Design a protein with these regions (language model features):
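FAD-binding core of flavoproteins
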Residues: 1-65, 75, 168-173, 177-190
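Active-site lining segments that contact anionic ligands and/or coordinate catalytic metals
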Residues: 9-11, 31, 43, 82, ...
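C-terminal helix-coil-helix/basic helical segment that borders enzyme active sites and/or dimer interfaces
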Residues: 64-78, 91-124, 137-145
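Alpha-helix capping/hinge segments and adjacent helical runs
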Residues: 119-190
Length: 190
């Protein structure tokens, strides 16, 4: 068992002991399977990004509703600068994630494998989701931490976003490799 909600099915481990595939049943050349499966990873990672962006936005809706009605020392929490800064920070992180996700999708539509664009989107959106859930919990205080809230569920779910389909550190290593290999071309838009 792993931490976090598994309503979506989760992941599992398969073990093949002594499996032999007759040559007439082999679909590709030996060793080509990983490359073939990686073709679907870009679009799949963007699908994760889209779902995570929705969760991050939901965290902000819940947080805004709460701080809009909750008062502390006679002042609505929404009127406090410290709260506004937290909400504004998350809003801009979500928007950056949206733009990176749309750009990566556009690159895929152009026939590009978009490996660096997908990596950028995956890292940014996973971090934005984790941050959005964390801020929503913080703004709601102990109530936000309760297992009775959607935000608590999203927080546990969101933590896995920085691990599944490649840990954030792996994607950052991929980006560093692209920067080294492409030089100034790394920054080209199209």
């Amino acid at each position: 068992p792993i931490m976090g909600p598994e309503e979506h099915g989760g992941h599992c481990e398969l073990e093949f002991d002594g499996l032999e595939v007759p040559m007439e049943n082999v679909l590709m050349n030996e060793g080509d399977g990983l490359r073939a499966t990686q073709i679907r990873l870009g679009p799949a990672r963007l699908t994760h990004c889209m779902r995570w962006l929705g969760f991050a936005k939901r965290c902000m809706e819940i947080a805004q509703e709460y701080v809009g009605r909750r008062e502390g020392f006679g002042i609505k929490l929404a009127d406090r600068e410290s709260v506004q800064i937290k909400l504004g920070d998350v809003a801009h992180q979500i928007q950056i994630g949206r733009l990176l996700t749309m750009h990566a999708a556009w690159k895929l539509d152009q026939g590009d494998r978009a490996r660096k664009e997908v990596s950028m989107a995956k890292v940014q959106v996973a971090d934005a989701l984790h941050h959005a859930a964390d801020v929503a919990i913080q703004l709601q205080g102990a109530r936000g931490y309760s297992k009775d809230t959607v935000v608590e569920w999203i927080y546990r779910y969101g933590r896995s976003a920085r691990l599944v389909d490649g840990a954030s550190e792996v994607h950052k290593m991929v980006l560093a490799r692209f920067m080294r290999e492409e030089g100034r071309d790394f920054w080209k838009w199209g």
